[in-house]
Amino acid sequence: PIAGSMVLAAILLKLGGYGIIRMMQTLPTTKTDMFIPFIVLALWGAILANLTCLQQTDLKSLIAYSSISHMGLVVATIIIQTPWGLSGAMALMIAHGFTSSALFCLANTTYERTHTRILILTRGFHNILPMTTTWWLLANLMNIAMPPTLNFTGELLIMSTLFNWCPTTIIMLGLSMLITASYSLHMFLSTQMGPTPLNSQTEPTHSREHLLMTLHLFPLMLISLKPELVI
């Protein structure tokens, strides 16, 4: 059920991140080298999740692994326990909550019309449903943290925190962001571009689907204009 995926990606994963923030306040600060393995593990996990995204053929699995990779960055920056790091983690969790939920919603919109989640069988929707293509483009741009969205603010704060803590982490961060951009572009091109494989008539999008997407992306755009609300 798509509602379960949306709630899991938007709320439950982020509650886990919030729990880690609360738990870290009871632990000693990272002046010792005790937390280095956890930070490296979180960043390496983010890269592996991103690489897994690149080889996915199932649209829903791709979006799910995308959520995992973003949480890797969040966990890495929470462990460092700096004000900028916590602000960046909160910003990215809230922004990615909206984005991943919107992507799951769009995947379901495609699934209802094609009855498949295989990427190669969901091509050519820009010819059939141009408004949905616009929503896909916006959601993917937010997923790759395009300025001036809240995703960009969060990732910038996370990058600054990790770079100040250890400059070599920029290699892993940069690689992670590069792969994120690659699979987001791959997801957009696979679902929207190319010839349509459908021979049957496709049902047009309904107002409720556009309303659902508006309620995901417009609050995120508004929060992006005033990020002090969340950080």
Curated annotation (Swiss-Prot):
Alphabetical UniProt keywords: Electron transport, Membrane, Mitochondrion, NAD, Respiratory chain, Translocase, Transmembrane, Transmembrane helix, Transport, Ubiquinone
Compartment annotation: Mitochondrion membrane
Biological processes per GO annotation: ATP synthesis coupled electron transport; electron transport coupled proton transport
Source organism superkingdom: Eukaryota
Top-level EC class as recorded in UniProt: translocase
This enzyme's EC code(s): 7.1.1.2
Single GO MF descriptor: ubiquinone binding
GO cellular component: mitochondrial membrane
Spans through the membrane: 1-21, 34-54, 63-85, 89-111, 128-148, 169-189
Membrane topology: Multi-pass membrane protein
Database matches in Pfam families: Proton_antipo_M (PF00361)
Catalysed reactions, as listed in the record: a ubiquinone + NADH + 5 H(+)(in) = a ubiquinol + NAD(+) + 4 H(+)(out)
Family: Belongs to the complex I subunit 4 family.
PANTHER family documented for this protein: NADH-UBIQUINONE OXIDOREDUCTASE CHAIN 4 (PTHR43507:SF20)
Function: Core subunit of the mitochondrial membrane respiratory chain NADH dehydrogenase (Complex I) that is believed to belong to the minimal assembly required for catalysis. Complex I functions in the transfer of electrons from NADH to the respiratory chain. The immediate electron acceptor for the enzyme is believed to be ubiquinone.
The protein's name in its UniProt record: NADH-ubiquinone oxidoreductase chain 4
Gene name tied to this protein: MT-ND4
